[in-house]
């Protein structure tokens, strides 16, 4: 198939729409846990094609959005130190901390760089041997192998001035946290795309069985998502809760074994505080103790006193599937992409950014 045109074929999408609306006979709340899915759902107006029984619920699928304010404050403290080049992905620069943001600090003269790839941090360290280069690494298992690859190069080449602030997180743990909340009503899940390429589909089987909820691993294109929704509808009707791999063209049961081995070589699980979800055991990654000499949280003073979230912002509720962006009183008004109050409006994968771009009201 043509990966663009065929997966956006209007006639095929409308045919799936008819099947979904015909076979869907009771409410089905589907949570996607991938920011790319959120944007595709809104961009292609899929809620209007699935009928009245299907409700898309947006979960913690954006790594920038789930970053707690305390970690942003740590980043700002490190970036403010003398003789430091601080680098991270561009979306992180605009996320507000308790008192400031990386973008504001850069405007004040601090050397803060937005990287295109983690390997750019290695080049910076080699080109600036008199500087301490700190790489603030974020992302799910999709980007963790790239950070592990960078660590490996630093170790092999004996680079002495590059440090890591690791903020990588994993998928299964937050799903368990969400499902343990008695206020959450989720009937099925759209499994992440790129994350699953690394992890494989096998890791979701335990979740599906534990919570008796079907999971469909879906690609990003509208045809992918519609086919996945149809499968979830049919599983609901049949009373089954299996893992359906719609994205089989990219996702295998065991995932990318070499990438997982590289991650395991340098990282180990740790507890991590998620925005909106609180601390979740073994949901994050950190450098192994033998590589603590590269860990910015070990080598520098990262202690901070973080303020609570803005009372006007409901990002936490959105990430738990308890609210939608349009439920927020400041959405599209005080809070917008030029002046984000919360992280869900900052990131290109955030639910609020998707609603603002594709379905803004008023």
Regions found by a protein language model. Name each.
Residues 227-317:
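Internal helical hairpin/lid segments
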Residues 168-175, 255-258:
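Short, conserved secondary-structure transition motifs
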Residues 165, 183-249:
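A conserved active-site cap/scaffold subdomain adjacent to cofactor or substrate pockets
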Residues 1-130, 144, 152-157, 165, ...:
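Metallocofactor- and cofactor-centric catalytic cores in central/energy metabolism, strongly enriched
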Residues 27-30, 162, 238-248, 274, ...:
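Flexible, glycine/charged-enriched surface loops at secondary-structure junctions
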Residues 145-149, 176-178, 200-203, 227-229:
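A short secondary-structure junction signal
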């Amino acid at each position: 198939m043509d990966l663009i045109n065929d997966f956006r074929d209007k006639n095929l999408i409308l045919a799936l729409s008819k099947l979904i609306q015909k076979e869907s006979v009771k409410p089905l709340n589907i949570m996607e846990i991938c920011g790319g899915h959120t944007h595709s759902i809104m961009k292609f107006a899929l809620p209007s094609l699935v009928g009245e029984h299907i409700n898309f619920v947006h979960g913690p699928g954006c790594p920038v959005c789930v970053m707690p304010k305390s970690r942003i404050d740590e980043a700002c403290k490190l970036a403010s130190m003398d003789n430091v080049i601080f680098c991270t992905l561009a979306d992180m620069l605009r996320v507000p901390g308790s008192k400031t943001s990386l973008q504001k600090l850069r405007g004040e003269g601090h050397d803060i760089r937005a990287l295109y790839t983690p390997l750019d941090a290695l080049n910076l360290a080699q080109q600036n041997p008199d500087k301490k280069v700190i790489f603030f690494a974020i992302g799910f298992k999709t980007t963790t192998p790239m950070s592990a690859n960078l660590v490996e190069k630093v170790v092999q080449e004996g680079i002495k001035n590059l440090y890591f602030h690791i903020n990588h997180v994993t998928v299964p743990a937050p799903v368990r946290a969400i499902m343990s909340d008695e206020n959450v009503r989720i009937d099925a899940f759209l499994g992440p795309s790129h994350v699953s390429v690394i992890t494989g589909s096998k890791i979701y089987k335990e979740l599906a069985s534990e919570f008796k909820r079907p999971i469909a691993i879906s690609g990003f294109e509208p045809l992918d998502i519609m086919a996945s929704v149809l499968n979830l509808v049919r599983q609901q009707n049949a009373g089954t809760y299996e893992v359906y791999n719609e994205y089989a063209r990219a996702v295998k049961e065991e995932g990318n074994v070499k990438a997982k081995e590289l991650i395991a070589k340098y990282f180990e699980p740790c507890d991590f505080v998620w925005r909106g979800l609180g601390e979740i055991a073994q949901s994050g990654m950190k450098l192994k103790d033998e590589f603590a000499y590269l860990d910015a949280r070990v080598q520098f003073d990262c202690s901070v006193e973080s303020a609570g979230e803005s009372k006007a912002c409901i990002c936490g509720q959105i990430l738990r599937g308890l609210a939608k962006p349009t439920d927020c009183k400041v959405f599209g008004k005080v809070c917008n992409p030029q002046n984000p109050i919360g992280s869900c409006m900052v990131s290109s994968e955030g639910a609020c950014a998707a609603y603002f771009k594709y379905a803004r009201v008023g």
